Regions:
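Carbohydrate-active enzyme catalytic cores, enriched for enzymes
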Residues: 44-178, 182
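Secondary-structure boundary elements
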Residues: 19-22, 32-33, 69, 172-174, ...
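Generic alpha-helical structural context detector
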Residues: 12, 87-91, 201
Length: 289
């Protein structure tokens, strides 16, 4: 998101000074390239970080408003990414007071950002059950969110946390079960601990996480604690019925080290407002015992 903030500054300079039209056009090209390289087709950052989604949406809207005020034409790609980012934000934040703590997100209240959107007359809506590697079950009081997505590519993993199949449950906008979250201001040891599977509401084996992070590079400022070995979700099945909703998903994060696939099934019984869950370790030929 820092690149987007810098890009927005360049665009503002190009719009402010009349003799900087060439600079403005160049800045728009940088913005277009940034969008292409850092977002998936649904408008979600490739890092899969909810906090990054919110920050990027804020600055993308700000850029659009600047261009509109300057009476320049708003690029179609900017309109499209704002629409898609907005829907993804709505998907993750609806009926919640704060962002869910997955994949680098910290404890941020939604209230101020919602005021920002309302002030500028932006209204996004998305009622999907699955999007961006997350699945959501909800009713008027309960919100259940689970991470069922692959780990990101190395270059997008700066804040990634190895919490695949972890979940959060919120009731009346109060969290009952949550992950640890990520704090960029903490020291490197604490940040690394917060990225472990043990810091999430999911299963870990023998004090090992489902992903492995590198902790030393010749140039740490650029590559600190990025992924060395990620994981893939090898199965997911979502069932939506009148009386219940169910997710079954599994990942291969323990396959190379232990020879097991981790499968998790969670069912939300709507009338009773209860959750039933089970974890399975599925043995393959590589498992020693």
């Amino acid at each position: 998101e820092n690149k987007l903030i810098c890009c927005s500054s360049l665009i503002l300079v190009g719009l402010t000074f009349k003799n900087q039209n060439k600079h403005y056009r160049s800045s728009l090209s940088i913005l277009q390239k940034f969008i292409k390289n850092n977002f998936d087709n649904s408008g979600f950052p490739k890092s899969r970080n909810p906090e990054e989604l919110m920050i990027c949406l804020k600055y993308l809207i700000l850029i659009k408003e600047w261009i509109k005020e300057s009476q320049n034409q708003i690029p179609d790609y900017l309109e499209e990414i704002i629409f898609n980012c907005g829907k993804s934000y709505s998907f993750l934040s609806k009926n919640l007071n704060e962002l869910p703590l997955f994949n680098g997100s910290s404890e941020i209240k939604n209230e101020e950002f919602e005021k920002y959107l309302n002030y500028l007359n932006y209204n996004f809506n998305d009622n999907s059950k699955e999007k961006n590697g997350y699945v959501i079950f909800k009713d008027k009081k309960i919100v259940f969110i689970m991470d069922i997505g692959n780990s990101p590519d190395f270059k997008y993993s700066k804040k990634y946390q190895s919490g695949c199949l972890s979940f959060e449950i919120t009731s009346n906008k109060e969290k009952l079960i949550c992950n640890l979250g990520f704090d960029i201001n903490k020291n490197n040891k604490i940040k690394l601990l917060s990225r472990s599977t043990a810091a999430h509401s999911t299963l870990y084996l023998n004090n090992h996480s489902s992903c492995i992070f590198r902790t030393s590079y010749p140039f740490k400022i650029h590559h600190e604690n990025r992924l060395r070995e990620g994981l893939k979700v090898v199965k997911k099945k979502i069932v939506i019925e009148k009386d219940f909703e169910n997710i079954i998903a599994s990942h291969n994060g323990y396959q190379n080290r232990y020879g097991y696939i981790h499968e998790r099934s969670i069912k939300f019984i709507k009338k009773e407002k209860i959750f039933l869950g089970i974890d399975n370790l599925i043995k393959n030929k590589k498992a020693s015992n």
